[in-house]
């Protein structure tokens, strides 16, 4: 008889069930299920083949990126949030080529919906989408393959200065500029404010036919082989902004160790780092042989960047239609935000320039691209990443971006506290540097959300081996940082082939492999109005210690400072008493005197049992002590007017304002109550003594009881058990008066009677009383 096989796969075989199965087992660490379930594993490989290699051209290595975002099911404006995510962080003004597919239709697993974000046309307008720093990492064979693949989708355009042939190109772009673009490449389709559109694929030759006689005669169309030799290092820290610059050939890398800056318009980076010159021969899948290192002098000490910023700012203030500025402002630039080309091209480079090559007038001199200075993209964002936190608010991001560019000398566009850029430019550039982080904040009228990168699926296009990178959350799955470690597993999840990398190393090693990035959305707040009010609050900076996972306006958050827990059921008299005593407190106990009032979980606002634990946070040493503490917490005495309040039946606690320093007395309540309990136990254990000794002991005990009545009354005890009959009679709770001599005599008489009954050995009364105490 065959053994029954236990099947743990309860997911459907559609795309939603496939990725729910994959993410569930990945989060649980059940790698055996990911390998052993042949049905789901076959569906996974079929999905990757259909989305990564849709054109059946496997050798092309498209370096495609797919985003799979998991959004909680209680977020109803999911599509709108994803559009905001794409527009603000990826600078995608036009979303008609991007497909946002909702995979969850019938079954919703793990209370989350899955969305697939793909761009089959141009890979989110950047073939190097979501890569850190790499310069000409593709070899000539891969570049030619990319050219062939891109030519099948988008033909290379022929640009002319004739207004009749191309009406979208305005006259503010001169023919001299377009005649020099044939040595560079542009990426994607970008739509600016003047509705001018450039469409040319990455690493595709742009042959320019110049019809203007004033164009430069030295610039002629080049062959594809020459284009590959002087390949444009179109790489970016993230997303869809291109960095068009030339890189010298491999034998000439040695002179770059000590570069000389020949152009005054170029302002290097603020920091000085060692950057990796990514000139790899072949793409490697399992090993990382290392690449040549070059010293990048990011900034010279004798170089002042402030004068250059003012020079850039003065150029921007000129007339936008001046042809002399347009011709002199030609440069090979790499800017974060693509500003409107109605202004000069130099203004866009003065706004947000991360790295650029030598600049100059093409009419006056021929630029030696071979000796152009190479600056890694990482050198320009090192200071930003080091100062970033995982939960960065939009205003903090805004201040960080402006501060970073001011320090680097690139010109943040501020002069005497006035901003030059409008809101549209800021909204498209503030998040560009921060989008590389595994944690991305989205603040809108819909709410305050955070996208956290949890894992990455990578496939080798040659061997079809599937790699899995998992971020180590350190017990914080909703918080991410650039300093987190990533574990890179092979297709078998073997522990012998496990690599620990950073996110930068991971994306740099597997830079030419297609990837699927798994993001998880975290709800910080459901309403954006609360967040905006918190941003306007000047005390917001002091709240850095509070976790972002809690609501910003929460009144139920607990601090690390020592607190005194108060009962949840208190009346107005107790509140008035607390307010009066705060002004009179001498501050003997600083930790207790700082508390202005009770801070508790209110059952009407939070239906949980946590309040029960807070009530019993203080312990007692005996049942007798508990009984006296409960009695003293129920009954309060007014020393000024000698009014007696009987609350034993109602169970309400009232503290009058005439009692001095209750917080100080409260700190000594345990000691006083324990002393009284010890004396009571000692007295019960003693043998019968003389009558004089009994009277003297009773007087001392009465004094202790009187002094401890108010000290043990700050914390209300549980109301589930009634006060024992014996202790009720001993305390004199049934008497109308309590502070007179008559009450003292009555108290003394009752204590003596209790002693006599005990010494006489009356069985019935003695046993009942002892049972009441026990």
UniProtKB/Swiss-Prot annotation:
Region listing for Disordered, in residue ranges: 145-269, 281-322, 338-367, 387-423, 557-603, 637-701
Localisation: Cytoplasm
GO terms under cellular component: cell periphery; cytoplasm; plasma membrane
Polar residues composition bias: residue spans: 159-179, 234-244, 260-269, 284-297, 557-566
GO biological process: intracellular monoatomic ion homeostasis; intracellular signal transduction
Comp. bias intervals (Basic and acidic residues): 311-321, 637-649
Biased composition (Basic residues): 680-689
Biased composition (Acidic residues): 222-233, 413-423, 577-591
PTM-bearing positions, type Phosphoserine: 165, 304, 616, 622, 707, 720
Main localization of the protein described in the UniProt heading: cytoplasm
Keyword set, alphabetical order: Cytoplasm, Phosphoprotein
Highest taxon of the lineage: Eukaryota
Chain intervals with Low complexity compositional bias: 180-218, 338-358, 667-679
Something else known: Present with 222 molecules/cell in log phase SD medium.
Purpose: May be involved in the Ras/cAMP signaling pathway.
Protein's name in the database: Protein GIS4
Gene name of the encoded protein: GIS4
């Amino acid at each position: 008889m065959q053994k029954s096989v236990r099947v743990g796969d309860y997911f459907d075989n559609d795309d939603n069930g496939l990725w729910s199965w994959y993410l569930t087992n990945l989060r649980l660490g059940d790698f055996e299920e990911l390998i052993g379930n042949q049905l789901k594993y076959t569906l996974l490989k079929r999905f990757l083949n259909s989305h990564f290699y849709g054109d059946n051209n496997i050798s092309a290595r498209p370096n495609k990126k797919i985003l799979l975002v998991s959004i909680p099911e209680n977020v109803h404006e999911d599509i709108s949030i994803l559009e905001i995510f794409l527009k603000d962080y990826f600078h995608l003004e036009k979303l008609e080529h991007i497909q946002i597919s909702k995979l969850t239709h019938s079954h919703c697993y793990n209370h989350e919906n899955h969305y697939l974000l793909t761009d089959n046309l141009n890979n989110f307008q950047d073939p190097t989408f979501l890569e850190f720093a790499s310069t000409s990492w593709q070899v000539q064979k891969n570049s030619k393959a990319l050219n062939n693949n891109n030519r099948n989708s988008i033909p290379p355009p022929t640009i002319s200065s004739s207004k009749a042939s191309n009406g979208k190109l305005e006259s503010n772009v001169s023919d001299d500029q377009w005649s020099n673009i044939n040595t560079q490449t542009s990426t994607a389709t970008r739509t600016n404010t003047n509705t001018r559109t450039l469409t040319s694929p990455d690493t595709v030759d742009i042959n320019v036919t110049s019809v203007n006689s004033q164009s430069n005669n030295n610039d002629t169309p080049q062959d594809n082989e020459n284009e590959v030799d002087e390949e444009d290092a179109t790489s970016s820290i993230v997303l869809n902004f291109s960095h068009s610059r030339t890189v010298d050939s491999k034998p000439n890398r040695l002179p770059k160790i000590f570069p000389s800056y020949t152009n005054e318009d170029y302002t290097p980076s603020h920091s000085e780092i060692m950057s990796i010159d990514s000139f790899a021969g072949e793409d490697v899948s399992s090993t990382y042989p290392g690449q040549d290192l070059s010293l990048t002098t990011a900034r010279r000490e004798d170089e002042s960047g402030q004068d250059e910023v003012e020079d850039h700012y003065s150029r921007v203030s000129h007339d936008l239609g001046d042809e002399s500025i347009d011709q002199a402002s030609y440069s090979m630039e790499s800017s974060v935000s693509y500003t409107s080309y109605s202004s000069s091209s130099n203004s866009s480079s003065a706004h947000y320039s991360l790295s650029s090559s030598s600049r100059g007038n093409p009419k006056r001199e021929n630029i030696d691209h071979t000796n152009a200075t190479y600056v890694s993209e990482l050198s320009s964002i090192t200071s930003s990443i080091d100062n970033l936190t995982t939960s960065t608010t939009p205003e903090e991001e805004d201040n960080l971006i402006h501060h970073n560019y001011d320090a680097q000398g690139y010109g943040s566009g501020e002069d005497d506290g006035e901003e030059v850029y409008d809101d549209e430019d800021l909204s498209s550039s503030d998040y560009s540097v921060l989008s590389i982080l595994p944690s991305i904040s989205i603040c809108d009228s819909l709410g305050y959300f955070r996208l956290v990168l949890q894992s990455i699926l990578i496939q080798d296009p040659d061997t079809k081996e599937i790699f899995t990178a998992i971020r180590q959350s350190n017990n914080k799955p909703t918080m991410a940082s650039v300093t987190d470690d990533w574990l890179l597993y092979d297709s078998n999840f073997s522990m012998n082939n496990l690599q620990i990398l950073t996110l930068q190393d991971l994306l740099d090693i597997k830079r030419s492999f297609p990837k699927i990035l798994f993001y998880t959305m975290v709800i910080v707040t459901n309403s954006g109005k609360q967040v905006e009010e918190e941003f306007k609050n000047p005390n917001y900076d002091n709240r850095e210690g509070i976790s972002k996972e809690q609501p910003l306006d929460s009144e139920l958050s607990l601090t690390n400072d020592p607190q005194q827990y108060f009962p949840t059921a208190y009346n107005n008299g107790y509140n008035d008493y607390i307010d009066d005593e705060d002004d009179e407190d001498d501050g003997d106990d600083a930790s207790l005197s700082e508390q202005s009032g009770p801070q508790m979980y209110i059952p009407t606002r939070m239906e949980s049992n946590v309040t029960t634990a807070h009530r019993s946070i203080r312990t007692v040493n005996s049942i007798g002590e508990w009984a006296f503490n409960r009695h003293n917490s129920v009954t309060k005495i007014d020393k000024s007017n000698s009014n007696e309040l009987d609350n034993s039946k109602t169970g309400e606690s009232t503290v009058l304002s005439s009692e001095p320093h209750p917080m100080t007395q409260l700190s000594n309540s345990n000691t006083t109550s324990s002393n009284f309990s010890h004396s009571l136990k000692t007295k019960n254990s003693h043998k019968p003594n003389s009558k004089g000794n009994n009277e003297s002991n009773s007087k001392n005990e009465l004094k202790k009881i009187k002094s401890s009545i108010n000290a043990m009354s700050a914390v209300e005890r549980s109301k589930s058990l009634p006060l024992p009959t014996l202790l009720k009679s001993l305390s004199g709770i049934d008497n109308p008066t309590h502070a007179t001599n008559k009450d003292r005599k009555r108290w003394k008489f009752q204590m003596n009677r209790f002693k006599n009954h005990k010494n006489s050995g009356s069985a019935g009364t003695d046993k009942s009383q002892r049972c009441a105490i026990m």
